[in-house]
């Protein structure tokens, strides 16, 4: 009896043990990452030919303690390598693991290689050559703490390489894991199987091979035993012949069918090629199709299983599309696949919850470094009175109502950017802004008392409902999570896409960036204030302080201002302001842009302006500003400097976002100024719910 070890992906060990026992293995013992077992020579070959789950089958040769590199060398050399290699056989060493002595796996592999070569030269035998790419014999050494385990890898290449996939092709899941997913899916061979996001077809091909009794090793050309002296070619040929006979019989007798689709025509072509090379191409129908067009291929029965490994993302900006995809799949399953089973394998359990289905079973597994889950569902048969379920139905109804109200109003106003929803319902605490045919969903960070998983699920429901109600493409929804604005956080950089969208606001054309910053370059709540500035600016010298992207300057320029001066500390935003001005034909000496600390510039400037717009931060302690600034505390000092720059008969429009801001009217009077609050006049319909989003004042000489 041979003592053997079969390695596998984490989480599949028990499944592999059952598979090996069914092949005839005895004394199976599960350990992390594999199964120790025993079997005769025939079982060695059968495990190589028939195991769908094993990554490699190895023949342990011995162990040694490693306290120095000499210990490793002598421990390896103690094995009788000359009796193991056929004459002229090439070899390669795979070394994994480190300890205090062997700190580099390449060094460990070199020591093992030297020991094997020296074992031949000491007996005056020809030394075997190393062939890293296609060796006849693979030696596997695993170092754990002070113990090195040495084994012969009888597989050669990993057993996931079945021989039907082009090695150059990238597979999101290995064939061994795909086989496990099929086995755990609840699918019964003989019933239909459909994968609506099949990629290169791995799940369907593995299922078809299982269903038709086709050995996974049947199409492999190379093995790790070809240079091994104990290889029994006669038994191997018997095992191979039996596998070929069973495959022919299984294919001839199989009557059910497999269906695969994907939106990428190139991967569908690869899937067809892979299925043909695997010998089961005639059983699978592959189509280029998007999930949105998914339809039941057998509406009159029989029932089958939908099995897939849908995409999952690691970046926030990929989530809206994925949420929409999973929500859509859930709806299609309920509407068209009543009575069917569904099994999905994913690294994102939160995305699976977007299906709005209850799982009957779930399994955990590793896909490389990723922790994954497989969930199995049974889709209830639909009845005549079944109503489609909408995620976040209360939110969806409110959004639908708001859309009807604001869409017509915005068209009449001549604006493309407006707020559609502003935390109207407390449990759906988001803002939804439309920018032409794009939508930005801003989630206010939930309090720590709210369960993070529930908050995330609610956000997913919101995104799914938003896409459904507005009828937008998922890739035109941008998701942002933000805390209530706190000073400098307002301008936090999020990304580097550099994608700008041109939008219109009344008669102005403006650039917005929906992805790279917390804000987009256009404060929607200041829209009416900007229009008022345009109406007030004809023939006047206009100053814009804390200008951000200069949208107020654009309105003033289009309103006929004699000159505009735009001041901000950020070079990024000044360059953005320049692009906005250029987009509207506002160029030349009459339109100055100044990069400066606005407070310092204000103290030093001695020019005169007819119209000044200032929208300072509520609080700022930027390193580039000379002093910390608090708008409540410091607004009088600000007005004192502004008065010096204000030409006789001129006007200051002063705005800020501090909730509960109190204008010091007595202090203003002492400066010879008076203030008129115009906040209500500057709040448009889409911000009517949020009366405190900003406050706005007109200040003139008393």
Swiss-Prot record:
| PROSITE patterns hit by this protein | THUMP, UPF0020
Spell out the subcellular localization from the entry.
Cytoplasm
Broad class of where this protein is predominantly found? cytoplasm
Entry GO MF terms: 23S rRNA (guanine(2445)-N(2))-methyltransferase activity; RNA binding; rRNA (guanine-N7-)-methyltransferase activity
Pfam families registered for this protein in UniProt:
Methyltrans_SAM, RlmL_1st, THUMP, UPF0020
Domain called THUMP: residue spans: 43-154
**From what superkingdom does this record's organism come?**
Bacteria
In short, the EC number is: 2.1.1.173, 2.1.1.264
Enzymatic reactions: guanosine(2445) in 23S rRNA + S-adenosyl-L-methionine = N(2)-methylguanosine(2445) in 23S rRNA + S-adenosyl-L-homocysteine + H(+); guanosine(2069) in 23S rRNA + S-adenosyl-L-methionine = N(2)-methylguanosine(2069) in 23S rRNA + S-adenosyl-L-homocysteine + H(+)
Tell me which InterPro entries the record gives. 23SrRNA_methyltr_KL (IPR017244), DNA_methylase_N6_adenine_CS (IPR002052), RlmKL-like_Mtase (IPR000241), RlmKL-like_Mtase_CS (IPR053943), RlmL_1st (IPR054170), SAM-dep_methyl-trfase (IPR019614), SAM-dependent_MTases_sf (IPR029063), THUMP_dom (IPR004114)
Q: Which UniProt keywords apply?
A: Cytoplasm, Methyltransferase, RNA-binding, rRNA processing, S-adenosyl-L-methionine, Transferase
State the GO CC annotations.
cytoplasm
| Cytoplasm listed as a keyword | yes
Which family does the entry's similarity section mention?
A: Belongs to the methyltransferase superfamily. RlmKL family.
- Function, as annotated: Specifically methylates the guanine in position 2445 (m2G2445) and the guanine in position 2069 (m7G2069) of 23S rRNA.
Protein name, as recorded: Ribosomal RNA large subunit methyltransferase K/L
Species name: Escherichia coli O6:H1 (strain CFT073 / ATCC 700928 / UPEC)
Species lineage:
Bacteria, Pseudomonadati, Pseudomonadota, Gammaproteobacteria, Enterobacterales
């Amino acid at each position: 009896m041979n003592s053997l070890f079969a390695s596998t992906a984490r989480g599949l060990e028990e499944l592999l043990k059952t598979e090996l026992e069914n092949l005839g293995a005895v004394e199976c013992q599960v350990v992390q990452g594999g199964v120790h077992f025993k079997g005769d020579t025939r079982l060695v070959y059968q495990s190589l030919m028939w195991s769908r789950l094993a990554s490699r089958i190895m023949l342990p040769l011995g162990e040694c303690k490693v306290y120095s590199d000499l210990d490793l060398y002598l421990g390896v050399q103690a094995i009788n390598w000359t009796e193991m290699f056929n004459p002229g056989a090439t070899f390669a060493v795979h070394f994994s693991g480190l300890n205090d002595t062997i700190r580099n796996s390449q060094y460990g592999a070199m020591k093992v290689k030297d020991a094997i070569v020296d074992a031949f030269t000491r007996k005056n035998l020809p030394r075997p050559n190393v062939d890293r790419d296609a060796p006849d014999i693979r030696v596997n050494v695993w170092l754990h703490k002070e113990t090195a385990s040495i084994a012969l890898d009888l597989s050669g290449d990993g057993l996931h390489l079945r021989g039907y996939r082009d090695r150059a092709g990238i597979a999101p899941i290995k064939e061994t894991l795909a086989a496990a997913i099929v086995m755990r899916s609840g699918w019964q061979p003989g019933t239909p199987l459909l994968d609506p996001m099949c990629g290169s077809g791995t799940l369907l091909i593995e299922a078809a091979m299982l269903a038709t009794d086709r050995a996974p090793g049947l199409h492999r050309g190379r093995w790790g035993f070809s240079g091994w002296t104990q290889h029994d070619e006669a038994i191997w040929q018997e095992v191979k012949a039996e596998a070929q006979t069973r495959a022919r019989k299984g294919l001839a007798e199989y009557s059910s069918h497999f269906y695969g689709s994907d939106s990428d025509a190139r991967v569908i072509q690869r899937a067809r090629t892979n299925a043909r090379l695997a010998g089961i191409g005639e059983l699978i129908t592959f189509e280029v199709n998007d999930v949105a067009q998914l339809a039941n291929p057998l509406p009159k029965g029989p029932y089958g299983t939908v099995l897939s490994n849908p995409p999952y993302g690691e970046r926030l900006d990929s989530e809206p599309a994925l949420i929409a995809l999973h929500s859509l799949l859930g709806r299609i399953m309920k509407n068209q696949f009543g009575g069917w089973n569904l099994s999905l394998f994913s690294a994102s359990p939160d995305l699976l919850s977007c299906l709005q289905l209850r799982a009957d079973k779930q399994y955990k597994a590793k896909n490389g470094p990723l922790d994954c889950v497989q969930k199995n569902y049974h889709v209830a048969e639909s009845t005549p009175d079944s109503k489609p379920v909408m995620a976040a139905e209360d939110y969806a109804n409110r959004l639908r109502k708001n859309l009807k109200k604001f869409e017509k109003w915005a068209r009449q106003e001549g604006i493309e950017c407006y707020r559609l929803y502003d935390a109207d319902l407390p449990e759906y605490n988001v803002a939804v802004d439309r920018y032409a045919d794009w939508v930005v969903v801003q989630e206010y960070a939930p309090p720590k008392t709210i369960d993070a998983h529930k908050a995330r699920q609610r956000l997913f429901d919101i995104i799914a409902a938003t896409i459904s109600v507005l009828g937008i493409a998922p890739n035109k929804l941008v998701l942002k999570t933000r805390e209530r604005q706190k000073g400098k956080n307002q301008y936090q950089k999020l990304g580097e896409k550099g994608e700008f969208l041109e939008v219109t606001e009344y008669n102005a054309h403006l650039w917005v960036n929906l992805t790279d910053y917390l804000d987009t370059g256009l404060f929607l709540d200041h829209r009416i204030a900007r229009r008022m500035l345009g109406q007030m600016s004809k023939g006047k010298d206009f100053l814009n302080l804390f200008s951000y992207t200069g949208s107020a300057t654009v309105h003033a320029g289009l309103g006929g201002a004699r000159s505009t001066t735009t001041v901000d500390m950020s070079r990024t935003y000044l360059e953005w302001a320049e692009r906005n001005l250029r987009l509207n034909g506002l160029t030349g000496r009459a339109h100055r842009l100044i990069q400066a600390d606005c407070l310092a510039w204000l103290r030093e400037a001695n020019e005169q302006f007819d119209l000044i717009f200032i929208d300072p931060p509520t609080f700022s302690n930027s390193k580039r500003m000379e002093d910390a600034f608090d708008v409540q505390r410091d607004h009088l000092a600000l007005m004192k400097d502004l008065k010096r720059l204000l030409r006789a008969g001129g006007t200051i429009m002063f705005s800020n976002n501090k909730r509960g801001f109190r204008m010091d009217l007595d202090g203003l009077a002492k400066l010879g100024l008076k203030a008129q609050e115009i906040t209500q006049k500057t709040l448009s319909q889409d911000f009517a719910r949020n009366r405190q989003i900003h406050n706005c004042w007109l200040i003139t000489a008393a």
